[in-house]
Amino acid sequence: WTKDFMDNMQSEINATLSSTLGVETRECSGQDKIDCSKLHSTFKLPIEYVNPEELHPLSDVVTQDLELVKEEGELSVYERLFQPTNILGHNLIDDWKKQFTSNKQYLLDTQRVISETIPPASFFDNSGTSDQEFVKNWEELKINHDTFLEKYGFIEFSMLESFNRSPLFLQLLSVANMMSPVVSLMLPFIFLIFPFIILKVRGIPISLNTYITVLMDIAKHHFIGKMLNNVKNISPTNLIYMLFGTGMFFYQIYQNIISCKRFYRNVQKLSSHLMIFKDYLGHSIESIEQFVLKHKDKTSYLEFCRESYRHKMVLIDIKRILDVHETSDFSVFDIGKIGSLLKNYYELHSNQEYERSLRYSMGFEGFLDNLRGLKLHVSKKAVYNVGINDETAC
């Protein structure tokens, strides 16, 4: 009942926010091709939502003169101001230096945002996952599509790629991949046992001669049958053939075992990745929700809150999919869950709507990290609000 109560509360909050913000759809804005050059490519700072006529770009010359950027190894003004503590916060520094605004309402609202916001602790501080590990997991998820399909044993033929979204099909395919070494090892024993079954079914008395006759007939087109046949007519050529065939047989078994172990390790890895993304999504959803609830009434932040809310709803959809995964420690006892694991990992890899919202959440996490650094300066009285009124020139 506790889970149902929390779900109902979440639904009430979402309904209230949707009504207040005037958001009627879960579709996120910007359906163009995703820019993969930076992690937070779909995220825009609140300043970028103000009237374009009141948004003024900063040239590279000005940013250099103001020391807003520095050479590698030196700290810029923005880095000293925001004190980024992780990769996501550091990556956002370049976005701050691109423009400034003369919109007084935005400046006043931003002062209130800084004073009223209590940013939650960074996901990387409490989760046991470092920012480098998180980014590495993301890069592995977003590797080249063909490489991704081959690495995790998905169907590579484009006309059949829809099967990669079928948990049942992926489960059967995965079990077949992992069983191939066992089947290869058992094949000789199957050949040796099968003649007994045939003779028994036919009601033929079992003797050594009848057994060998049936065995040779069954295995005549297989390596084992040919090897048994060559035993009768041993010669240097047949001996070489037997040794080569035996070597190839065991080499095939070895390759199957290596392939099976590699596949198992990859499944263990993606299981761990999904749990990290699941925990991150829970943190990100809560962070966005708290910010939107706190600042949705600020005029110049309304569009930013709307966009954040839209992406939050998509993040909720993603987390709902990942909630079925309960542990990152995949073992042989979890083999029955492989189909679901692979399907969900493929969905995260290929679904562009999910990618847009995940990239947006990384930008939002970086934004909160910058806000934490700025708040620290304010608390130490190293940074003060400037007075703004109707007579103040902007």
Give the role of each language-model region.
Residues 1-324, 346-374, 385:
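Conserved amphipathic alpha-helical "coupling/scaffold" segments
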Residues 333-334, 339-347:
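A membrane-cytosol interface segment of integral membrane proteins
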Residues 375-394:
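Long, charged, glycine-rich C-terminal linkers/tails
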